[in-house]
Amino acid sequence: MERIKELRNLMSQSRTREILTKTTVDHMAIIKKYTSGRQEKNPALRMKWMMAMKYPITADKRITEMIPERNEQGQTLWSKMNDAGSDRVMVSPLAVTWWNRNGPMTNTVHYPKIYKTYFERVERLKHGTFGPVHFRNQVKIRRRVDINPGHADLSAKEAQDVIMEVVFPNEVGARILTSESQLTITKEKKEELQDCKISPLMVAYMLERELVRKTRFLPVAGGTSSVYIEVLHLTQGTCWEQMYTPGGEVRNDDVDQSLIIAARNIVRRAAVSADPLASLLEMCHSTQIGGIRMVDILRQNPTEEQAVDICKAAMGLRISSSFSFGGFTFKRTSGSSVKREEEVLTGNLQTLKIRVHEGYEEFTMVGRRATAILRKATRRLIQLIVSGRDEQSIAEAIIVAMVFSQEDCMIKAVRGDLNFVNRANQRLNPMHQLLRHFQKDAKVLFQNWGVEPIDNVMGMIGILPDMTPSIEMSMRGVRVSKMGVDEYSSMERVVVSIDRFLRVRDQRGNVLLSPEEVSETQGTEKLTITYSSSMMWEINGPESVLVNTYQWIIRNWETVKIQWSQNPTMLYNKMEFEPFQSLVPKAIRGQYSGFVRTLFQQMRDVLGTFDTAQIIKLLPFAAAPPKQSRMQFSSFTVNVRGSGMRILVRGNSPVFNYNKATKRLTVLGKDAGTLTEDPDEGTAGVESAVLRGFLILGKEDRRYGPALSINELSNLAKGEKANVLIGQGDVVLVMKRKRDSSILTDSQTATKRIRMAIN
């Protein structure tokens, strides 16, 4: 009541009324701004004002039992007054100091695990080396970069499920952990974080950093892998750069790098096979990178590179809508065109059929070492503004743009015939023919292009046909700029289609990518790439083909053996024997094949001539299309170790050495595996194994289906008949006995019956 009286008294004085109405505080908007909502509007001011009070902090009541009322200096740490509107107590900032000095120690074992990404960053910086600072103009271009080293590659949704499962396992809500990486991470984290006292929210934040790739669109000159981006602020400014070598690598950068190498190898190999698309898919599905299936990585990893995008397109995944030509990524920024076939004549009077883009268009071109802006009309380059690291890189960009412009003077600059072929020996399309031609030598192209006087524009200079800079003249329409062109920032992905020859098109039918665009650069992968597909055996050279082929036969011997006797043609056509053919001299391949096939036929016809080691050894030679000839061979030549080495038709050699006693095969001194099967040289063991409990009825009878191996016989029902392959490579018809009592006599009658059945 007293208060209200006092206020009424104040209000009756005219001066009070004037102050309250004339000053701006009565603006409802301002009052609202500072009083509505929970969000603090001026945190700095609030903090200063709060800290000026004696007890600015509130704490749980239990704190009064854990902290003394006064510290050693006799200062009060908490007030006996309750916080208005809650049952908490008011505490002095000095209480925090006391707690930090004298409070209970907590277990720190979980800190390095939770804050793993920070601890690892400190280690990388500790071991990194900073070099000299150079002052020079920095050509920075904005690229989408990974800013978070050391992460797994889960999608936001996958990570959310993992985090919920680890941090809040008892919360309700459907969580489906499907991918291998999700399950592994969840198990690992649950074990690591047992009895963890750090707040669940903090744990969730830190897990997110570890599981999800975070990207930003940042200006970069130099390394773009995440271990360089984390120190971007230390290594490059507007006019300076500091050399830096990271003090450690992170798995996500290694995955990106190894994925690009694997994809390039696979696309290059698929392009030369009979059915490129089927081969590519087979290889992607059977390849592992650092122990993880390549297809899983492709689904999660956002790396954009030509070969990687071709693999993604083959798997039906969306990719970026930009297209690739001459190793540059083109993105149309304005204009449009229609395509029309046109025949043009080169300087050598060769006719080329090109698809002409009619209409005005503008593009950005982004390469590894140069970038450009291109404006063009129908078969005419209007303007090209290039920036690049060095003369060579700038020249590359100019050549690509000139070819892409389809100008007549470019086509007339061709000297000699265009007959470039791809790895599969097929002619390249005309645009790539032109590109390859001028990439080899662009002198005539630049000379014929023409020059023009130029205006003095800030940040731009001219470039002459011999690639020297100039401020007076420049090649027509071409300028060099100090500023780079930013990479296309959008993360948009489009649905694409891919044809059998690995050409990727958007839904309008424009070709975005083709195998010609895949870089030939060879690198060494950081993570182990395991190609299980036979198509990739040759990647490590001829020796690897030899060893892998024989390993494959030994691993699959049971089925190979049956096919050898039943359906040899199908066996000879197996794709696993394809790589081997490149080791056999072309001129004699057919004769070797004819010879081996005849030899094998004799083995099938004549009892007791079946020889496991010899079949394994000669089988790959039978895969080539056979030529009939009377030639007899005692040895075959294979091209390995840079020269011809010999495989003996009968007997061992350094190339192929089979030890009958241990059943171990060594190829070129490398272990190629051990044969696990019944000894088929002596017949006794085989017969008892085959025939115990079976009655031999006579010769093979095709009505009872293909021959079974010994191991498959056990599945027969009593009284059931089947053909079976016995040790010598012969096939006989047997019946499973109806009674078990007569098993003993089987082995004795077996030998007689087999001889009768076969003869």
UniProtKB/Swiss-Prot annotation:
Keywords of the record: Cap snatching, Eukaryotic host gene expression shutoff by virus, Eukaryotic host transcription shutoff by virus, Host gene expression shutoff by virus, Host mitochondrion, Host nucleus, Host-virus interaction, Inhibition of host innate immune response by virus, Inhibition of host MAVS by virus, Inhibition of host RLR pathway by virus, Inhibition of host RNA polymerase II by virus, mRNA capping, mRNA processing, Viral immunoevasion, Viral transcription, Virion
A GO cellular-component term linked to this record: host cell mitochondrion
Domain of life: Viruses
Location (main, coarse): virion
Pfam families: Flu_PB2_1st, Flu_PB2_2nd, Flu_PB2_3rd, Flu_PB2_4th, Flu_PB2_5th, Flu_PB2_6th, Flu_PB2_7th
Subcellular location: Virion; Host nucleus; Host mitochondrion
Site positions for Mammalian adaptation: K627
BP GO annotations: 7-methylguanosine mRNA capping; cap snatching; DNA-templated transcription; symbiont-mediated suppression of host cytoplasmic pattern recognition receptor signaling pathway via inhibition of MAVS activity; symbiont-mediated suppression of host gene expression; symbiont-mediated suppression of host mRNA transcription via inhibition of RNA polymerase II activity; viral RNA genome replication
Gene3D superfamilies to which the protein is assigned, alphabetical: Polymerase Basic Protein 2, C-terminal domain
Motif Nuclear localization signal: where in chain: 736-739
GO molecular function terms attached to this record: RNA binding; RNA-directed RNA polymerase activity
UniProt keyword Glycosyltransferase, yes or no: no
InterPro entries membership: Flu_PB2_2nd (IPR049110), Flu_PB2_6th (IPR049114), Flu_PB2_C (IPR049115), Flu_PB2_CAP-bd (IPR048298), Flu_PB2_middle (IPR049111), Flu_PB2_N (IPR049106), INV_PB2 (IPR001591), PB2_helical (IPR049113)
Keyword Disulfide bond: no
Record text on subunit structure and interactions: Influenza RNA polymerase is composed of three subunits: PB1, PB2 and PA. Interacts (via N-terminus) with PB1 (via C-terminus). Interacts with nucleoprotein NP (via N-terminus). Interacts (via N-terminus) with host MAVS (via N-terminus); this interaction inhibits host innate immune response.
Record family assignment: Belongs to the influenza viruses PB2 family.
Function (record text): Plays an essential role in transcription initiation and cap-stealing mechanism, in which cellular capped pre-mRNAs are used to generate primers for viral transcription. Recognizes and binds the 7-methylguanosine-containing cap of the target pre-RNA which is subsequently cleaved after 10-13 nucleotides by the viral protein PA. Plays a role in the initiation of the viral genome replication and modulates the activity of the ribonucleoprotein (RNP) complex.
Name listed for the protein in its UniProt record: Polymerase basic protein 2
The organism of origin for this protein: Influenza A virus (strain A/Henry/1936 H1N1)
